[in-house]
Amino acid sequence: MKTEQLNLETPGGATIAHVARPDDAAGSGAAAAVILIHEWWGMTDHVRDLAGRYAAEGFTCVAPDLFRGKTTKDPEEASRLMHGLAIEDGLATISSAVAETRRAYGAQKIGITGYCMGGTFALRAACEVEGLAAAAPFYGDIPEDEALGRLRIPVLFIAGARDNWITPEKVNELKEAANRFDLPVEVVSYDADHAFFNDTRPEVYDPEAAANAWQRVLALFRERLQ
């Protein structure tokens, strides 16, 4: 696996993305790429580890830093960082990451995933950012109907039935919108808590649910990107 940084320019200011690439990426890079959006903690070692897992599966993984260098382990500070990030700013960073991934690595098809806050941005980007081919948001908030009505790419939405943030009621809103607008959305819910995929948080991590969700996401990206 190869790792490096990618510089991103946005109207809100410059930032970087952590990049993990397969060892056997030929030429300008792997043709299939995944944009990975971090949780409200920022660009943590856990995010870099996840990028490496995608690279090990043959994808170029680009994880943009939406907080421009800020990280925290404190939930109150994380909440302030998240609520201080305008949707438009985050989407602009994602759009820049998509464009730079195509330019720097020759990526032909690009997917997006994210967790918690990153899941919110991944789903919103699936509706609004050009150049994406598939999305796999984990327990992110649901956009309003105006945004969802623009969704055209397949979405695998991963949820936890015991999630007190992205509750089953919110997930049902997504299901209802998918039916109403005939959207290409599949929802998979596990008997698990919010953030069940994060193996650095033993109080919520669910290894069985995480392993199953991982295989589902890989299947989606292999079908749509590779």
Give residue spans per PLM region:
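N-terminal cap/leader regions of alpha/beta-hydrolase-fold enzymes
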Residues: 1-226
